């Protein structure tokens, strides 16, 4: 939201009161409390009338400083905040001089200037990260538009801003206005299903605005050298998070807001769905599954979308027996084929649902402020919305899902959760509906994930569309409704990179696009992109996404890249496990891996899976693609995973690829654990493993880790090169029937033992 009109003027009707001086600073053992006046205090008369702001500086985690700004303390209802499961009270250091007071937490400090001339300076060591200074912190009065608190933090020359949730606009957010409100808008607009009021910069710090309700970000779009964030109300809280690297920022962010548990290994395989409004029944599903098997197309999960239930009745949690006469027997047959089953749900109950009257009577829906049930025709006619702030409503909802799990479902696609009313409604626990709008997605997904963990244990997984800050605790998430075009494929990737830059470890998208019918080139290129993502799902709206309906070559592309992903699973699953321990996502923007390479600061058409594998999807019908390989002179060559071609880093190249190829490069000095299985993602990663060594320098060592399908470390060790001699040593766990591979030359396998020495001749 813009409050100014250019550099000097205010918007008509705006009265702005900016922090002008730190009139008083109270230093406590664990905090600083600053009385910020909005005018310089020259004499006693200046202390009368006009607002003051109380600014409290604390630390919830080493390397994180929280700034809580408050105008009126007692005239607003209790506020909701982002769940911070890791918040504590770490030891801080408070120091005071004649002119400044500072608070230090870990490597991060904030200096408060005493007296006239408002200034908060955030430093990591001696390096200034960002500042709140002249006309940065303000209290705004705007008549019918309400009162607002805003902060503006400075941007340095060349500083880029990233994140702010799943945003499909350009990955670098400078110049954009971002409204932190979940909306069901699709990927072709500025709205987002998963708002996260957090941004990361290439200067090595992040900012998390700790607000549940709407926050408006002006990213260099009101004051070009500042990020402004504001909310309506009498207060504003935010946290500055230290690096120094982007990965360090994400480690601290997720230590504060929570990390994802490890998804089951089977979930990394190929998912296929019925699509949305297509005509389908048991025969359709069975035909698709059998045809996949006949064509030797590996499949791990089959998903039944909305119409597994009867039309007009979502959700009643009952199979439509016209198309699925004996669902329990059907699911047993599908399980016997080695498949997992996913069912579509949403948090609404339509008026025609047999459950509707019961739920109204029990009071389990969100109500209007007159006490009646809130209903709408937007989506299901007459639908009402489950109130998850009511423990009984949550238990009722979980009870229906528990029954579905008992009869053969394995997981749920938790769709919707964005179109939640913000005005004129009442929640069971009295929560402010404005602040609940975004948090609703968290409560919905938490209710489902909590039940899945109880019943399925480590196999718990959702396929969620809506979320909010800290929602990474309930994986997996997908990018929502996209078009079947190259442009939409690219915007989907931008959304994924923005989301994973906010600490979400796992992300997916609809292979082939959701809306429309994908041309063959789009479909095949999206298959490549989809299988080189953390989770991979074929899904559409009004047309099926099975490959043989596109063309025969699509089957070959799908087979090739599904099998490739399966063989990469020992590497990918170790990186997935790493994400659960560190908060660094599996799918990483180039900036995360190469923060010191200026070329990586703006790249949003390629990414890395872990630190070793670079992926550049092809977004052209011709197969032409530009790819940048980071590095500098002497840093070693990147190796194409499929062809073995080597290229020096630190330069761009323009490549041409057929549909069975794409830019997949392995970083120099890497060891990729290569699996023995091509037909399924969940297998013993420590048996038949080949440690593929790429451009390991003479005298250097490279680590490897293999995590078992149950989440345990199966093997950990290093590969060392001395001249032409390579020695792999397993220091923890064990490998069986394993080998080394250097540039396609493979050692004899070692049945057992922790050391494999081989000379590459």
Where are the regions a protein language model picked out?
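Active-site-proximal structural scaffolding
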Residues: 50, 191-192, 200, 229-231, ...
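Conserved, mostly hydrophobic/aromatic
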Residues: 57, 107, 198, 292, ...
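Short, well-ordered loop/turn elements at secondary-structure boundaries
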Residues: 97-99, 104-106, 115, 192-195, ...
């Amino acid at each position: 939201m813009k409050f100014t009109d250019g550099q000097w003027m205010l918007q008509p009707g705006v009265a702005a009161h900016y922090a002008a001086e730190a009139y008083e600073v109270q230093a406590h053992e664990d905090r600083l409390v600053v009385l910020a006046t909005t005018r310089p205090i020259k004499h006693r008369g200046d202390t009368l009338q006009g607002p003051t702001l109380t600014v409290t500086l604390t630390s919830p985690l080493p390397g994180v400083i929280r700034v809580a700004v408050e105008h009126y303390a007692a005239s607003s209802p209790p506020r909701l905040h982002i769940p911070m499961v890791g918040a504590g009270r770490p030891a801080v250091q408070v120091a005071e001089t004649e002119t400044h007071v500072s608070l230090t937490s870990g490597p991060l400090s904030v200096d408060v200037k005493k007296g006239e001339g408002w200034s908060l300076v955030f430093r990591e060591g001696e390096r200034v990260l960002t500042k709140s200074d002249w006309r940065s912190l303000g209290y705004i009065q705007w008549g019918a538009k309400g009162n607002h608190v805003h902060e503006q933090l400075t941007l340095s020359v060349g500083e880029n801003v990233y994140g702010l949730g799943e945003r499909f606009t350009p990955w670098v957010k400078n110049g954009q206005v971002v409204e932190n409100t979940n909306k069901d808008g699709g990927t072709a607009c500025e709205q987002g299903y998963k708002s996260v009021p957090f941004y990361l910069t290439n200067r090595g710090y992040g900012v998390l605005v700790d607000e549940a309700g709407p926050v408006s970000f002006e990213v260099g779009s009101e004051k070009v050298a500042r990020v402004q964030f504001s909310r309506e109300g009498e207060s504003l809280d935010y946290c500055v998070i230290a690096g120094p690297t982007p990965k360090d920022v994400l480690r601290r962010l997720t230590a504060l807001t929570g990390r994802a548990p490890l998804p089951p290994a089977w979930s990394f395989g190929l998912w296929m769905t019925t699509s949305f409004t297509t005509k389908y029944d048991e025969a359709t599903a069975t035909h698709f599954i059998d045809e996949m098997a006949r064509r030797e197309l590996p499949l791990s999960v089959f998903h039944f979308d909305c119409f597994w239930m009867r039309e007009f009745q979502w959700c009643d949690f009952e199979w439509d027996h016209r198309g699925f006469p004996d669902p329990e027997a059907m699911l047993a047959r599908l399980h016997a084929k080695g498949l997992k089953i996913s069912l579509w749900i949403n948090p609404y109950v339509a008026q025609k649902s047999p459950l509707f009257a019961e739920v109204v009577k029990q009071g389990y829906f969100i109500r209007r402020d007159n006490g009646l049930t809130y209903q709408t025709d937007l989506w299901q006619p007459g639908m009402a919305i489950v109130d998850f702030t009511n423990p009984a409503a949550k238990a009722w909802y979980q009870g229906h899902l528990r029954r579905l799990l008992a009869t053969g479902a394995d997981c749920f696609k938790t769709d919707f959760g964005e179109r939640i009313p913000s005005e004129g409604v009442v929640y069971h626990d009295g929560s402010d509906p404005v602040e609940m709008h975004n948090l609703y997605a968290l409560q919905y997904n938490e209710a489902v994930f909590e039940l899945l963990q109880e019943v399925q244990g480590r196999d718990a997984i959702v396929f969620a569309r809506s979320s909010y800050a800290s929602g990474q605790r309930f994986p997996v998430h997908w990018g929502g409704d996209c078009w079947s075009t190259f442009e939409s494929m690219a915007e989907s990737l931008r959304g994924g990179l923005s989301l994973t830059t906010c600490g979400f470890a796992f992300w997916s998208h609809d292979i082939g696009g959701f809306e429309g019918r994908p041309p063959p080139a789009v479909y095949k290129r999206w298959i490549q992109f989809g299988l080189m993502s953390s989770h991979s799902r074929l899904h559409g709206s009004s047309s099926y996404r099975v490959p043989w309906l596109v063309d025969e070559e699509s089957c070959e592309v799908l087979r090739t890249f599904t099998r490739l992903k399966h063989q990469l699973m020992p590497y990918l699953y170790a990186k997935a496990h790493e994400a659960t321990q560190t908060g660094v996502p599996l799918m990483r923007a180039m900036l995360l891996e190469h923060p010191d390479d200026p070329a990586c600061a703006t790249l949003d058409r390629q990414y890395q899976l872990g630190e070793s594998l670079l992926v550049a999807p092809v977004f052209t019908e011709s197969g032409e693609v530009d790819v940048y390989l980071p590095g500098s002179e002497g840093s070693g060559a990147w190796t194409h995973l499929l062809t073995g071609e080597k290229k020096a880093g630190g330069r761009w190249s323009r490549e041409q690829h057929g549909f069975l190829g794409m830019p997949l490069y392995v970083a120099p000095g890497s060891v990729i654990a290569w699996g023995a299985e091509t037909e399924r993602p969940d297998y013993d990663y420590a048996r038949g493993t080949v440690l593929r060594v790429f451009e390991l320098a003479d005298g250097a060592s490279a680590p490897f880790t293999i995590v078992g399908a149950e989440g345990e470390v199966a093997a950990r060790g290093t590969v060392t090169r001395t001249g032409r001699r390579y020695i792999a040593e397993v220091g923890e766990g064990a490998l069986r029937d394993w080998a080394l591979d250097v540039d396609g030359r493979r050692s004899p396998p070692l049945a057992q033992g922790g050391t494999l020495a081989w000379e590459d001749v």
